[in-house]
């Protein structure tokens, strides 16, 4: 008999993903085989499973919290916005098509049977499934074809816990309004509420909690404080809210250009966790002043973001930063932008477009998407700030729909191992001031990250920082801290009771 519980929210960014990871960690600590599940995820942060399937990063880090490998069944539908109106539809880890919102809304009912089959397949292998909804279940305009909130809870026949964010204000109105807009059978599925991101003395909430419980008949299971834990975020809302402002007193400042279609900004979590690194996400030219490294990150729409760079003045600012002797790095779409030429006869129909010209490369977009985890070795000789990383092993993953060819003046940055064969990747100039790669997750490799950060320190005349920091251990500690806080502030025994009362045979 598989047990399940689903977290839904009063809005986006209320903390569902993190709390779901916390429950995964708690059940894992308690000896239960646990898996996360989100039927449909809309995010530009994605990752690759060991068998080369693409899925949302949120379910990947939830799987890590549960002590298991990610499995594409944990996120069967991934929507990756390519513009304000279009999204790439990824089904079971592979690109299916592109659709606008209206077309996808009409298409969703055809996915229900497949989603339920995938969920049941996963549930047969685990003791507990922790499901996560998307946005709010009270989107009454989407209710009739819902496959991710109450529609999914109905398919899984599981209880729901509603998560509300008090930090944004109006928490009791959000709880009451959400429950009021649900149908009776949907309200009956909601067995508890968690108030999240509270700052201050919880005693101030007691009278409000009593009233909201009386008004709704739904118990508040706990009040989670605002936690200082370093865990991944699902989408760009956290960037807009300025979460990654960094620490002013750190020696090294790394600027990441916040592209309109930025993807996989989780690439930089390991950098931000370094004790001497300050991460700064930038959107204005003046914000590139006084940085030690500028990075163009991944993009879901390379040519659109390249046009934005030029229109916003950021392209000139990046080039000026480079002329001042500051290294510029590009990852995936950012790597493509650093080149001389981008040829797109597939995606945008814009044909041949000039890049920023910092790397003498030509990129051609392709129909097929490369999705794979890879091991790699940095080139044996690397210049400048990269020198100490020469020959180091690294690990990461590729998600791209293009091929980049190096021209005269560029050297290969690393060699990937694919099916036992060496494959060149990336480019670096002779002075090391321009460096690009398709490899996401590069900074999760501790030795590489410390080598390049120390290379940046050396450029400033600073001594190398010798540290035994391990990012994997750091993440494990964060999961444990989250679980400890949830046990302290949430009635976990009550959640167990809720699940046991609603467990279903699969």
Curated annotation (Swiss-Prot):
This is Cobyric acid synthase. Pathway: Cofactor biosynthesis; adenosylcobalamin biosynthesis. Keywords: Cobalamin biosynthesis, Glutamine amidotransferase. GO terms for molecular function: ABC-type vitamin B12 transporter activity; catalytic activity. Catalyzes amidations at positions B, D, E, and G on adenosylcobyrinic A,C-diamide. NH(2) groups are provided by glutamine, and one molecule of ATP is hydrogenolyzed for each amidation. SUPFAM superfamilies: Class I glutamine amidotransferase-like, P-loop containing nucleoside triphosphate hydrolases. It comes from Salmonella arizonae (strain ATCC BAA-731 / CDC346-86 / RSK2980). The active site is at 332 (nucleophile), 440. Belongs to the CobB/CobQ family. CobQ subfamily. Residues 251-448 form the GATase cobBQ-type domain. GO terms for biological process: cobalamin biosynthetic process.
